[in-house]
From Swiss-Prot:
Keywords for this protein: Cell cycle, Chromosome, Cytoplasm, Cytoskeleton, Developmental protein, Mitochondrion, Nucleus, Phosphoprotein
Species classification: Eukaryota, Metazoa, Chordata, Craniata, Vertebrata
The name this protein goes by in its record: KH domain-containing protein 3
Function field: Component of the subcortical maternal complex (SCMC), a multiprotein complex that plays a key role in early embryonic development. The SCMC complex is a structural constituent of cytoplasmic lattices, which consist in fibrous structures found in the cytoplasm of oocytes and preimplantation embryos. They are required to store maternal proteins critical for embryonic development, such as proteins that control epigenetic reprogramming of the preimplantation embryo, and prevent their degradation or activation.
Pfam families: MOEP19 (PF16005)
Residues found modified as Phosphothreonine: T267, T279
PANTHER family given in the database record: KH DOMAIN-CONTAINING PROTEIN 3, OOCYTE-EXPRESSED PROTEIN HOMOLOG-RELATED
One BP term from GO: actin filament organization
Location of region: Required for interaction with NUMA1 and regulation of apoptosis in response to DNA damage: 334-434
Stated family: Belongs to the KHDC1 family.
Domain of life: Eukaryota
Cellular component aspect of the GO annotation: cell cortex; centrosome; chromosome; cytoplasm; cytoplasmic lattice; mitochondrion; nucleus; protein-containing complex
Predominant location category: cytoplasm
Amino acid sequence: MATLKTFRTLVQLKHKLGKAYEIVGEPRLPKWFHVEYLEDPKKMYVEPTLVEIMFGKDGEHIPHVECTLHVLIHVNVWGPEKQAEILIFGPPNFQKDVAQMLSNVAHFCRMKLMEKEALEAGVERRLMAASKATTQPTPVKVRDAATQVAPVQVRDAAIQPAPVKVRDAATQVAPVQVHEVATQPVPVQVRDAATQPVPVRVRDAATQPVPVRVRDAATQPVPVRVRDAATQPVPVRVRDAATEPVPVQVRDAATQPAPVQVRDAATQPAPVQVRDAATQPAPVQVRDAATQPAPVQVRDAATQPAPVQVRDAATQPAPVQVRDAATQPAPVQVREAATQQTPVEVADDTQLVQLKAGEAFAQHTSGKVHQDVNGQSPIEVCEGATQRHSVDASEALSQKCPEDLEGGDTETSLDDSYVIIRPSRAVWEPFVML
């Protein structure tokens, strides 16, 4: 008969009658445990092998579990054939919770045990297979000889060598020879003899040389000669003879040589006057002479001091004014004297000599100059004004104001185109004293 095995616990209990248990001896009970909890314990059954897995060897973890859960756990084991009995003493709600917890722990330990048993069984099977392999050498040799060696030899002998030889002899060599003999050499010879040489010769003889010669002889040389002879030389000659030389000669003879000859003959002033008179209109000269010179002389005479004007008239302005009058066209001087009488009268006090000379020159030359301007060309007017009336002006000045010009110096240009009159010292000395 199996003996009862008990595990360690905080309070040793003994089964009394029915479901009642009693305390063995007089142990010290925990404060959270009461005696009435011994009357109706909660029972559960597990495999005996799981008891030591759950509570340790001989139940060494039971006292710690009891203190933690505030219940008493009593385990009875009657051998490996029977299931172990677990008794839970405590409040009813605690009994239910602890029983559920212990069942979960038992299930977890059961699964671990099954894995362990399966692992051990697998290891045993592998060990058995290994032992069989070591103890049975003949099957190993048979497997190596029957499965490995024979197929390898058959594949090497039947599959590889035969196809290689057949492919080399039947498929590779014969087609190569046939291809070289039937397709390559014959077409090469035919193409070289029939297709290539003949077209080359035909193209060289029929297509290339003939077009080259035709293009050189028919298309290129002829147009070149025609263009050189018909298109280029003729226009060049026509342009040189008809368009360019004639205008050049006409322009040289009509426009350029004539002024050059006139300038050479008159020593530069005459051509300038002729070109100005011929190219520019007469109204331009009238406007310039009427608007610009007269106001300048009036402003100079009215605004500048008398001594400055006398000194300028005695030393510098007198030659300048006479030279301007001699080089510029006579109509300008006549028009200045004839049209601008009022400004001249303003300068009577300061420039007496110039005023009288201007009046005399205006009286003698105004009628003649207007007649010459109306009846002659601008060139003749300028020549008549500069050459013909210079003597009249000097005579008029000497006859009109002999008392003022007496004792003064008079100079005439080489070509008698103008007269320079320098008043005597008695005339301009009173102005200098001022």
